[in-house]
Every structure is written in structure tokens, then in C-alpha cells.
Amino acid sequence: MAGVGAGPLRAMGRQALLLLALCATGAQGLYFHIGETEKRCFIEEIPDETMVIGNYRTQMWDKQKEVFLPSTPGLGMHVEVKDPDGKVVLSRQYGSEGRFTFTSHTPGDHQICLHSNSTRMALFAGGKLRVHLDIQVGEHANNYPEIAAKDKLTELQLRARQLLDQVEQIQKEQDYQRYREERFRLTSESTNQRVLWWSIAQTVILILTGIWQMRHLKSFFEAKKLV
């Protein structure tokens, strides 16, 4: 697989899980290659109540010219998004180029999966497809020129709106970090408690084993009339 990205990617088998270290205050772009019916999944760490916009564009490999075609008419892309609880947030079929949007309602790792409808297209059968993907999270997902035109905002009002959105996103990030810290604390406490009880159990077992050995040896020596 060839790819260019701004985050660490990790393939895991045929349905690769590509881990993107994407910050919720920014946007990242990359491209990756997939084969026929192959699915690629990305893990995106997102706070709750945060809008996410994904833009993608596909290019099909021309075996004769050995180049990627600039467009792939007739080829579709299916996008599926699952929240940290495994609940499907979005599942929809798009065209060869498109945009998908969703809003997170549960903080944590969201799984974003894409695969083509290549089985319907003989030209792509057995070939490969290049997918350009750009994911925008948080206030960067807002189209401020469109907002300004719709709400008839002045430049100063628009700037104030952007600052308010940035502050809101920072608050969401802080809430999410506190949520992660709380989960980590609970996990640590649970682990420490299990370790403590295991240590106590080992100590009790050693004591009981020692008592049993002493009584067994005493019985042995008494039977041999050594004591």
C-alpha cells in the first residue's frame, strides 16, 4: 500500500485500521490505495457534540497507461461511521467524489470505514483505486464565508463568531481530556485493586502450604518414630 498522510497509519489485516492522529482543532489530508471490495477504516478521536466533515475523491488505475485516471465516473464509495459503543452513526452510498458529515454524540474513538462498489464495475475488477481523503473536525469544519453570507455578518462579527467557536471547541477538548483522565483513573484503581487481592491470595496460599508441609513432616517423623 502506498499512501501519504499527516498522521501515523497502521494496517491491520485486510480490513486495515489506519490510526490517524488527527487533532480536533485541525484538518488532515492523505491518500491511500485499496483493492477490489477492500475496506479501509480509520480511527478518529472526537469529543462529544462535535461536527466532522470528510471530503474524498477517487482515482482509478489505468492498467494500459499505467496511470491513475483523473476521475472515475460510475464508481461509488460507501461510507460507514461507528461511535465508541459500536453504534452506526452514518451508513450511506456516495459517488466517486463526495462529502460526508456527522456529529459525534459520544466522546472517544470513532471508526470511519470506506469501501467501493467495485464489484459492479468490470473496469476496476482486480485493480486498485486511489482515494484522497480530507477530514475536518470541530470549528474547522465550519464554512465561515457561507455563514457570513447567510447571516449577513460583518468582518468583525465573523471574526467574533470564529473566536467563540474556537473557545467552544477548546472547552469540548478539555471536557474530553477530563473524561479520559477519569476513565484512566478508574482503570488504574481497578487494576491496583486486582493486584492487591492477587497478592493477598498468594500470601494466604503460601501460608496454608507452609502449614500443610509442617504438619505433613510432623506426621512423617512421628510415623518413623524420629520425634
From Swiss-Prot:
Q: Where does the motif COPII vesicle coat-binding lie?
A: 220-221
Q: What are the boundaries of the signal sequence?
A: 1-29
| Keywords annotated in UniProt | Coiled coil, Endoplasmic reticulum, Glycoprotein, Membrane, Protein transport, Signal, Transmembrane, Transmembrane helix, Transport
Instruction: Locate the coiled-coil region(s) and give their ranges.
Output: 147-176
One record GO biological process: intracellular protein transport
Gene Ontology CC terms: COPII-coated ER to Golgi transport vesicle; endoplasmic reticulum; endoplasmic reticulum membrane; endoplasmic reticulum-Golgi intermediate compartment; Golgi apparatus
Per the record, the domain of life is Eukaryota
Q: Which InterPro entries match?
A: Emp24-like (IPR015720), GOLD_dom (IPR009038)
- Sorted alphabetically, which PROSITE patterns does this protein's record hold? GOLD
Q: Reply yes or no: does the keyword NAD apply.
A: no
Residues listed as glycosylation sites in the UniProt record: N117
Looking at the keywords, is Nucleus present?
no
Main localization is endoplasmic reticulum
| Cellular location(s) | Endoplasmic reticulum membrane
Q: List the Lumenal topological domains.
A: 30-194
Annotated TM spans: 195-212
Q: How does it sit in the membrane?
A: Single-pass type I membrane protein
Q: What does this protein do?
A: Involved in vesicular protein trafficking, mainly in the early secretory pathway. targeting. Involved in the maintenance of the Golgi apparatus. Appears to play a role in the biosynthesis of secreted cargo including processing. Involved in endoplasmic reticulum stress response. May play a role in the regulation of heat-shock response and apoptosis.
Protein family: Belongs to the EMP24/GP25L family.
The name this protein carries in UniProt is Transmembrane emp24 domain-containing protein 4
The uppermost taxa in this organism's lineage are: Eukaryota, Metazoa, Chordata, Craniata, Vertebrata
